[in-house]
């Protein structure tokens, strides 16, 4: 039974194709599926390791959300579509040496690609990290401009 007819109005809205939100269609016309893959399932699907998947999520290559966004240890959830997008992601990823032998992939998304729920400016974060990195490794950093 619907209280005050509110829900049935929403149902009617969901049935109208011109209202993109209720049909889960993004501005770019992609159909968004509900978050349905666990991190392990995504790893199987992508044929990558768990640490790689987490790195992809942190660097913005793989879109994911936490099951409970309020808990930092909550398990990640993603979609097949996000996994496919991560695989098709242009491979102009920059190798950034972290100074202690760890090399991480960092990729900057253009603002046109930022989907709902992504960190506001991933590129700005990377720039901040890179400038911190430069301070840390000043003196032993090789300048690629000089031979």
From Swiss-Prot:
Keywords: DNA recombination, DNA-binding, Viral genome excision. InterPro entries: HTH_17 (IPR041657). It comes from the Viruses. One of its GO terms (molecular function) is DNA binding. Pfam families: HTH_17. The keyword DNA-binding applies. GO terms for biological process: DNA recombination; provirus excision. Excisionase and integrase are necessary for the excision of prophage from the host genome by site-specific recombination. This is Excisionase. The lineage of its organism: Viruses, Duplodnaviria, Heunggongvirae, Uroviricota, Caudoviricetes.
């Amino acid at each position: 039974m619907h209280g005050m007819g509110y829900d049935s109005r929403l149902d009617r809205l969901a049935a109208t194709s011109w209202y993109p939100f209720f049909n889960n269609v993004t501005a770019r016309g992609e159909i968004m599926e509900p978050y349905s893959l666990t991190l392990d399932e995504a790893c199987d699907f992508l044929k990558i390791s768990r640490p790689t998947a987490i790195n992809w999520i942190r660097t913005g290559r793989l879109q994911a959300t936490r099951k409970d966004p309020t808990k930092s240890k909550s398990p990640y959830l993603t979609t097949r579509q996000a996994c496919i997008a991560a695989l098709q992601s242009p491979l102009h990823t920059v190798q950034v040496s972290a100074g202690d032998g760890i090399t991480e992939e960092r990729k900057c998304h253009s603002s046109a690609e930022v989907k709902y729920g992504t960190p506001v400016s991933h590129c700005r974060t990377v720039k901040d990290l890179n400038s911190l990195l430069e301070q840390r490794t000043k003196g032993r950093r090789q300048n690629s401009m000089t031979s």
